[in-house]
Amino acid sequence: STPLYSSAASDVYKRQPYQYSITPSSTYSVDPWIGCYSLIDNCNAILDNLETLPESSERNRIEGESLALRTYAYHYLIRMYAKPVNKYPDNPGVFVRLTSSTTDIPRSTVKDCYVQMVNDIEKACTLLTGTSSSSKCYITEQAAHGIAARIYLDLGDYTNGTSHANKALSEITLMSKADYKNKFCENNTETIWYFT
């Protein structure tokens, strides 16, 4: 037997997707929820403590990155755990927590989740204006616009979606065919932002 097969065979959670046996209680179902809310909690803790920093471009960058990451996490959650906004705007969405408080809150409607995401990502785009990074693991202006484009496309707002997509792609240089096979996992010119 091969090590890969033995490893997968020994772990029931690794086998579940291949046996079509994922259940609501399996880790494949809850890991995204836990991971996204952990990210949201971290972003909220940063946003709650921004006043301890002096007004500066660095503070704007930190606030913009936190808002964009929080928006990204809510967008991931809403697409995974709620119904589409265009057909079911009044259905339950996810819990929209905007502070690091642990007080129980009710689920917001899908529409309210999108309203909050739009508000946060638009503010993030403004705060991150002119930012760039040689590392693709930081949220920049282009990355925030990319997140905004996806949200507006979900809403069916193609005018704003196209506008944000164009801004996200404005500084992207396409790789040559030869570069593609050698730079798939590197900080290549076609990558706007990556999140792991």
Stretches found by the model and what they are:
Residues 73, 149-151:
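Residue-level signature for tetratricopeptide repeat
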Residues 8, 16, 157, 162-196:
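Hydrophobic-face positions in mid-chain alpha helices that act as interaction patches
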